[in-house]
């Protein structure tokens, strides 16, 4: 007895601890990130969005959607007359977004443009539909985009192409429009697509089959046609990084869809002069990013050659630059006096006195040279030639500065550069400054281990490069804490070789409270080592951390594992797997109740002698499937993309177990016990009275049962699921209050209904919004209804509880015997099947839940087993 109490207390403590960690993980995911260093974009005049008329048949077919132009001030009068003189850009909004979000790009373009180069921004109003969570609208939205492009181009006499800028799911629509038939859309009218926080690889949540099929069609088309019918296209994908809680940066990758010859995917933290993470909304109005985008677009439309190679060069310059020494300019220099030769490994030179400095390249003992300069000229030279390479330098933080850098790998110079024997640095004025780092011992290997910390000390080291060969998993997050006896602001650069997600020490930028001032100079600097995209391959390169320090000072670097950020990464990358594990746990719990009807749902969660083996079985089967079926969809999604680790199924299983334990305890012990106490006499009396009026009872019963079906037919499948949940709740209250033993099972079944209802909330919201625009019509008359079939099947399975209550058919009795005999095996098999077929397609859970409803009806409502 004492052991049982202790075990129960221990289990409850584990449940509570798991839920607390889950909530802490959510908090960490939402709030533990870098500050928002983006500046707000403001409009100088009142923004206006004139609505543009489309052909009558288009307006009739898509009454929920509209096309608008953006204008300010005097230009609005021309826009109202559909008179445009600039270059057309169509902004395609994302999930639940407003067409007014175009104002940031439109306003900045209006201010930066002139008569020779202007951008005319247009925006689509999708009625703020939940297109990322409800696939029934995606095809209609894509069709409307095609019609909008055709209408916009009809306003221009000479412009035959348009630029597409897609935010969130709008970026996917900008790619999907190329699948439209030729009479609706001409692929040659679009040559550049820019996407902001668009999940290209897969949907954030696989809510329904329409989303899955839409992604499959679009991505397969792009894989097949990228170098065929799409060979004129250039694509830029921007990801927000750590601050974007809605779209993970790995989903914005173009890996496998395009190649690097005509596409770029980059995190905003790596974009020059942005160097900041953006959240899902902020990426639209972040001033630094808007400026970079506008400058790039204005330069692109000025080019006479509108080919993909020219466009790509401009995009790389603004979003992912690299040093191209071939762009250097031959020049001739005169010298007032002999240059000073630099032999030190680390030195900082200032322009107090105009002077020239030379760094020898020939026979140098150093492996690498890195130069950070402000207002200085950099040259490569030999006895015959001097090459000005100042314009090839790359910008580095802080944002509002002329600070730039260049690095030379002396041992691997190109053949064309081996002719030069020195680097010349010319300080042009008193504000000129150059920091030079000549590195002999290039790298220091740091082996990171989980839940471990390391402390490194650097004395009189100007440059330090730390390489982390064991940093390869998404759940590995480490805190970097740099302290020093110097007040100089060090520059820290975190580089990930397989992804454009470089991060600079953003505290060297500006504080959010006062964007125009410099940060104070505390003695401690902090940042995180965190991956946003898993390592699919390394080619011998690993993540690295570069520290550019003051060689006259000493520094202490602490690297510590961050458990809070580990929890945050679990939420960010694995939360979408939770519905399937919730179903799995309920299956196991229900199997226990079939064997012992008196067990409450909460008590089944304490049967660890069953749950632990099932969780281990799932973890082992995961590993076996990964080994035996490496090309299966399940393995490609969870393992090949770098997301899987062995303990993942165990963590998700016990998280689901803890959540159901808490929910079932509240529902069963607190709510239903209270209802039983309050209503038992009344419901018993009403039940006895109704039993004497069988015809009247059957009529009420069938009217009640017909409501979910009618709701499905007259409204939508999502409405039907929610109606079915309400009916199941009433059934538990009615039958469960009278029959305590049956209530135990019906409570578990109610949780299955609740899971279905939650998965269908977005469809319910979509139909309510469509009613407000188009009237009280069934969803199937307005758009495809992904939940229609599942609602019909689940409702029919629910009805079996009542139709089988009078059944004496032999086949039903045989089926009941089979279900009882192989109960545990059938339900655990069902739980395992859900893991491999529904983890990434959770909309298929309704098929398995329908079987559960049939199972309940056969076992508990067929006469021979009635309570």
Task: State where each predicted segment sits.
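Serine-dependent carboxylesterase/thioesterase catalytic core
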Residues: 90-96, 122-246, 729-738, 756, ...
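Hydrophobic, mid-to-C-terminal alpha-helical segments
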Residues: 275-277, 284-315, 319
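Classical eukaryotic N-terminal signal peptides for Sec-dependent ER targeting/secretion
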Residues: 1-18, 818-821
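Membrane-interface motif at the C-terminal end of an N-terminal transmembrane signal
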Residues: 19-46, 220-229
């Amino acid at each position: 007895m004492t052991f049982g109490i202790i075990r129960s207390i221990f289990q409850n403590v584990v449940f509570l601890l798991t839920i607390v960690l889950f909530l802490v993980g959510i908090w960490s995911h939402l709030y533990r990130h870098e500050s928002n260093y983006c500046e707000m974009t403001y409009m100088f005049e009142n923004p206006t969005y004139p609505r543009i008329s489309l052909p009558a048949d288009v307006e009739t077919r898509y009454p929920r959607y509209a096309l608008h132009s953006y204008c300010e001030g005097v230009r609005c009068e021309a826009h109202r007359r559909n008179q445009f003189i600039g270059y057309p850009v169509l902004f395609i909004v994302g999930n639940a977004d407003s067409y007014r979000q175009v104002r940031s790009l439109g306003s900045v373009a209006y201010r930066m443009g002139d008569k020779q180069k202007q951008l005319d921004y247009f925006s689509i109003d999708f009625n703020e539909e939940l297109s990322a969570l409800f696939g029934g609208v995606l095809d209609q939205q894509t069709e409307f985009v095609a019609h909008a492009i055709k209408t916009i181009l009809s306003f221009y006499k000479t412009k035959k192409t348009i630029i597409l800028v897609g935010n969130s799911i709008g970026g996917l629509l900008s790619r999907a429009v190329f699948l439209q038939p030729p009479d609706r859309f001409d692929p040659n009218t679009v040559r550049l697509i820019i996407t902001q926080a668009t999940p290209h690889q897969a949907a954030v949540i696989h809510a329904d089959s329409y989303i899955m099929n839409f992604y499959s069609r679009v991505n397969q088309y792009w894989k097949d046609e990228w170098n065929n019918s799409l060979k004129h296209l250039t694509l830029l994908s921007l990801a927000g990084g750590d601050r974007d809680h809605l779209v993970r940066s790995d989903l914005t990758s173009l890996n496998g869809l395009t190649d690097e010859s005509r596409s770029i995917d980059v995190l905003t933290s790596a974009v020059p002069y942005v160097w900041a993470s953006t959240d899902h909304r902020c990426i639209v109005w972040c001033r630094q990013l808007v400026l970079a985008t506008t400058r790039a677009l204005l330069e692109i439309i000025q080019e006479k050659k509108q080919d993909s190679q020219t466009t790509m060069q401009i995009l790389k310059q603004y979003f992912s630059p690299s040093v191209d020494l071939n762009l250097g300019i031959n020049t001739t220099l005169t010298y007032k006096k002999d240059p000073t030769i630099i032999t030190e490994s680390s030195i900082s030179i200032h322009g107090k006195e105009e002077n020239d400095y030379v760094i020898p390249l020939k026979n140098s003992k150093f492996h690498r040279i890195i130069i950070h300069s402000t207002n200085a000229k950099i040259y490569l030279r030999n006895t015959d030639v001097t090459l000005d390479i100042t314009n090839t330098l790359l910008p580095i933080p802080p944002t509002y500065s002329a600070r730039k850098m260049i690095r030379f790998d002396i041992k691997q110079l190109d053949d064309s550069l081996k002719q030069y024997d020195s680097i010349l640095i010319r300080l042009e004025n008193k504000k000129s400054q150059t920091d030079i780092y000549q590195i002999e011992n290039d790298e220091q290997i740091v082996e990171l281990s989980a839940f471990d910390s390391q402390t490194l000390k650097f004395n009189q080291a100007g440059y330090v490069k730390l390489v982390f060969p064991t940093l390869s998993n998404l759940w590995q997050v480490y805190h970097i804490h740099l302290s020093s006896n110097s007040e100089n602001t060090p520059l820290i650069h975190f580089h990930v070789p397989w992804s454009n997600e470089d991060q600079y020490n953003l505290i060297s930028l500006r504080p959010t409270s006062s964007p125009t001032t410099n940060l104070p100079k505390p003695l401690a600097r902090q940042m995180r080592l965190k991956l946003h995209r898993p390592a699919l391959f390394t080619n011998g390169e690993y993540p690295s951390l570069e520290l550019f320090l003051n060689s006259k000072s000493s520094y202490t670097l602490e690297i510590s594992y961050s458990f809070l950020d580990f929890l945050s990464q679990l939420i960010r990358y694995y939360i979408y797997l939770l519905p399937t594990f919730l179903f799995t746990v309920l299956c196991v719990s229900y199997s226990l109740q079939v064997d012992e009807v008196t067990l409450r749902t909460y008590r089944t969660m304490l049967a660890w002698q069953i749950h632990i083996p099932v969780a281990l079985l799932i973890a082992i089967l995961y590993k076996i499937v990964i080994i035996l079926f490496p090309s299966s969809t399940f393995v490609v999604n969870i393992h090949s993309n770098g997301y899987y680790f062995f303990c993942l199924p165990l963590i998700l299983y016990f998280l689901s177990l803890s959540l159901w334990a808490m929910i079932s305890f509240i529902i069963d012990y607190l709510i239903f016990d209270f209802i039983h106490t309050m209503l038992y006499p009344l419901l018993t009396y009403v039940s006895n009275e109704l039993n004497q009026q069988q015809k009247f009872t059957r009529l009420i019963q069938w009217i009640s049962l017909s409501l979910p079906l009618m709701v499905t037919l007259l409204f939508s499948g999502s409405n039907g699921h929610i109606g079915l949940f309400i009916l199941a709740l009433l059934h538990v209250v009615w039958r469960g209050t009278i029959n305590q033993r049956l209530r135990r099972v019906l409570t578990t079944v109610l949780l299955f209904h609740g899971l279905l209802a939650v998965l269908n909330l977005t469809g319910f919201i979509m139909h309510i919004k469509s009613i407000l625009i188009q009237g009280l019509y069934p969803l199937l008359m307005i758009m495809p209804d992904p939940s229609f079939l599942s609602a019909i099947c689940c409702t029919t399975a629910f009805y079996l509880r009542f139709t089988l209550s009078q059944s004496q058919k032999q086949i039903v009795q045989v089926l009941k015997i089979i279900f009882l005999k192989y109960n545990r095996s059938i339900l655990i098999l069902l739980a395992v099947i859900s893991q491999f077929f529904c983890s990434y397609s959770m909309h298929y859970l309704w098929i398995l839940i329908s079987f559960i409803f049939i199972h309940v009806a056969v076992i508990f409502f067929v006469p021979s087993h009635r309570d």
